[in-house]
Every structure is written in C-alpha cells, then in structure tokens.
Amino acid sequence: MSHQHTEELNDQQIVRREKMEALTEQGIDPFGKRFERTATSGQLKEKYADKTKEELHDINETATIAGRLMTKRGKGKVGFAHLQDREGQIQIYVRKDTVGDDNYQIFKKADIGDFLGVEGEIMRTDMGELSIKATHITHLSKALRPLPEKFHGLTDVETIYRKRYLDLISNRESLERFITRSKIISEIRRYLDGLGFLEVETPVLHNEAGGAAAKPFTTHHNAQDMDMVLRIATELHLKRLIVGGMERVYEMGRIFRNEGMDATHNPEFTSIEVYQAYADFEDIMDLTEGIVQHAATAVKGDGPITYQGTEIKINEPFKRAHIVDLIKEVTGVDFWKEMTLAEAQALAQEKNVPLEKHYTSVGHIINAFFEEFVEETLIQPIFVYGHPVEVSPLAKKNADDPRFTDRFELFIMTKEYGNAFTELNDPIDQLERFKAQAAAKELGDDEATGIDYDYVEALEYGMPPTGGLGIGIDRLVMLLTDTTTIRDVLLFPTMK
C-alpha cells in the first residue's frame, strides 16, 4: 500500500527536495554514480586497531570509504560526522581549509540519511576515535525522507517488520542476525556439497499437495486451465530423483503452508530436505547432527550455545530415545503393551488427553500422548525415534515391531527442528498409506493429503533403500541467534 500520493510533504521533505534541485543546478547528480572505495569501516578499524594518534600521523596513510551519513555536527569551518556501511560506522573529520570551499558546501548541505564518499587521511582524534580527515567529499545519493525520529534503535515492531530496511539501518544487531542467517545457510550447503550431495531444484507449483501434513495454498494456471497448489514439501520430487539414480540430493528453498501464524510459524518458510541412497534413519541421525553442529560452529564457535538463558550442549553427541520409552518415563503409561483402541482411548481419558475424530488407532493416541506430555520436557538436543505408522505415512515400518516406523524427530528446547526416516520404498505399502490419508481427510483431518499416483508409479520402477531428512532453517536460525520469534529471522515476514 503506498501512502505517497495522498501525503503532504512536510517541511523537512520540502527542504530536502530543494537541496536536491540545488545539487542538479551545480551539475551534481543527486542520485550519484559508481564510486570506488578502497576500504570498509571494519577493515580500517581492524588494520589500525593498535596504532596510536602519533603513529597514524607518521604513517600518513589514506583511504576512500562510502556510506550513509548517520550523525553530523560542527560549526563554521570544521565538522564531524559518522558514515555507516555494512560493517559499522566510522567518523569523518572535515575542515573547510583542507577540502576547499565548494567541497565543504557539499558536506555542509548533506542531510542525515544521504550517502557520501569520503577520501582522506587516517587519523585518531584526541578522544582516541579512529577517523578519516577528509581531503575530498563526493555526494552519492540524496535521501528525500528523514529517518524516523528514533532511528537509533528503532523499537516499533510494526515498522521493523513492514519496513525492514529502516530496522537494518538503525539496529546493528538486526543486521548482524541476518548476516548470521546467510552464514548458516552457506555452511549447510558447504557441508553437504563436501559429502557429495547435489543441490537440485524441484517445482514450486504442484498438481497434488504431498510430502507433509499441511493445508496448501491453491492457485490456478490460466493457459492450462488447471488448479495447482504451492508446495508444502519437496519430498516426493526429491525421492523421484533417488529413483532416477542421483543417489545424494538436497534442496533448500521456500515451502508454503496455508495455516496459522505464531512465534515459530510463517506461511512461507525455508526448509532443507536431504535424501541419501543406501542409508537408513540412523545414518541420517549422524548426518543431521553434522548439519546442526557445523552450522552452530560456523556462527558460534565449537562450544555449547545459550538460548534464552539455557545452556544447550549442541557440541556434544545428541541423545537418542524411543518415543514409547519417553512417554513411559514421563507419564508411567506403557504403550509397548499390545492394546485395543478402546483401551488406549480409556488411558487418554484418564490422563485428560483430548481425542480427535480422526484418531482411529492406538498409534494416533501414542502420538497425542507424546505431544501432550513429552515435548515440553525435551530441552537438550534429542533424537526421538520410532513414531507410530499411522502418523508417518512416508516412513518405513520397523522390522522388529511394525506398529512403529524407522523415523525420528530432532527436538531442542521443546521444539521440533527436523524430521527424518528410512524412506518407504515399497509402492504397494505406499499406496495403502496414501489411501489411509485420503480416508482421514474425509473424516475431517484437513492436514491429510490426497493420493499421488504418479509418485507410486515412480516407486514401482524401484527405489534403493534410502534415508531422508527435513530441517526447518528458520527455526535453526532462531536457535543459533537466540531469537524468540520467527519474524526476527525472516527479512520480510508475512504481515496482514
């Protein structure tokens, strides 16, 4: 929504436009052109960190920097200012008798928010601040709007999320958090590429939602006159590539789920899915641990991390436990015993576990017990494995106890960070499970998906035993940046 057309220009905006016109009259483009820097603020601070005022005077080195004008003060023929680039701020010191009259006017007329290029000598002030004594100033771009009043530490969350650029200008820790996000993503790619995985791209527009339990966004392809959905997962396409012989593949990208928003859910989010032929879920536990630990080390070093005041031993081997053992530990209820649905329902009522209409088997109730009692107790990294077959439609059954699957979820600080399993590669079993999902959908489970016959056909050509994994990147970034809401790790979160 643009408010520009109805908004009256305020005094500041009028003055800035007049200054823009004055620059044009002087033959200076108010919006500048290419500019060659020799250094950034961070490079200069690092290079000259241990040099005294006198040493800098003797070395007499020069540099050219560029950035946004953030502070400005001075009287008459001398001025001080701070320029901000991606790495931080550096002070500039401007004297009329050094830069000359015309050049000094450019500095004098510059507004907070404008971009300037500054060439000059590296020095330290009497206060000990590393600065550049300008020999020449170049106007690079005019800001026609002043930054918001409280731009040193913008706190209005509406503005932070709607106008992220203002947040990045004014909140250093916010910019750092997004730089960290980029580093985490690069490190995960680097780690997987090093293990021989291929990064692939599969369609965002699907004919049938599949690969996860979620409500899709629907759209329409006009030329083909067909309804389509935005992907809720990349799973079924990636497994087709395993059928095709690609052996080790991953895809990192946006997933779309037409569901509620809260501190850990945004309708579009980033996930990575990884598939490895000839592996099982235990191999994938090792791989998952490797991905998470490499990402953590890249941005936090190789010790434990702190999340909201709790120390997380992310650098140590992750605990591994069966879902049924954990339920027994927390509630005393033992689901290893064979039992009827009625017996399980009675246990649920006894423990006040809410029952849904589509809970048609013991497996559904086991899962409900886990969500109700166990999740909130899981603080340190743990692989919870052995989920019931009814809630794991794409995972292989456990050979020793077919009520359960060779599946795990990674939990840290009560939240799920990853979901993985030995993939179901039996097309007959897969079709049965798709049919069970379709039946659950009929009973009102709006997260259940339909039947993907094309995928079943792919499996009929033969898929090697395979292990697969999905990790929510946004949640991982939240964990590694000690952030409590997903909106703080998405540059442009969905807003009403």
Curated annotation (Swiss-Prot):
PROSITE patterns in UniProt: AA_TRNA_LIGASE_II
CDD domains linked: LysRS_core, LysRS_N
SUPFAM superfamilies: Class II aaRS and biotin synthetases, Nucleic acid-binding proteins
EC number of the protein: 6.1.1.6
Cofactors that this protein relies on: Mg(2+)
GO biological process, one term: lysyl-tRNA aminoacylation
Positions annotated to bind Mg(2+) 2: 416
GO molecular-function term, one example from the UniProt record: lysine-tRNA ligase activity
Protein name: Lysine--tRNA ligase
Origin species: Streptococcus mutans serotype c (strain ATCC 700610 / UA159)
